[in-house]
Amino acid sequence: TNNLRGNLERELTALTVTRANRLGDLLDTQINTLTTLTLNNSLLLGIIEQNQSYKNNAAATQIEIDTKDKIWQTADSTNNNSDPLVREHLTNSAALNLFEYQKTFPDNIEVFVTDIHGALVGTTNRTSDYYQADETWWQAAYNNGQGAVYISDPQLDESTGKLGIQFALPLRNHSTGKIIGILRTTYILTPLNAALQAEIGETSETDMFIPGE
């Protein structure tokens, strides 16, 4: 009995390590491809233009963003991609760059970018909100202006209804190095999804060890 228990423990440990290492490799690859996307000049230009479009007044800027956020949420509540504000952000140059990335890396089921204030610039999907700066992932990636890579635990994404991992990375001005916006994606772990769902069961998220993090 002791030998059997010992063998089972060793096999389970090996399986856990293998799964963790495999997941670590997938996440490293994902971060590398997203980092390349953050260097896309056309994408950055769209973000810079939106940042420059605001009045030089923080209160007025927030009022403008809040107004658009209400319009956006109304459109989302009625599943309306034809709303002019939504349609603009699904079809502009930033969105087209994100769609191209998504075609190459289809496990990214939702990709979008915000400006420095957390307002959407372009997106592949109609998100639940226009304003994103109040989200944990946004604040973590912004990191008080220093920037950081954010990786969530596996969770059910409210916009897509699928189990995935959220990644968020800062977008920087090439000339100054300053953060100008945030890139976020929901990444579906297709090769591991069945195993993850079995572990999560009826809950919506789980803790996960990521090697090197």
Residue spans for each PLM region:
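A short beta-strand-loop micro-motif that forms or neighbors metal/cofactor-
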Residues: 178, 198-212
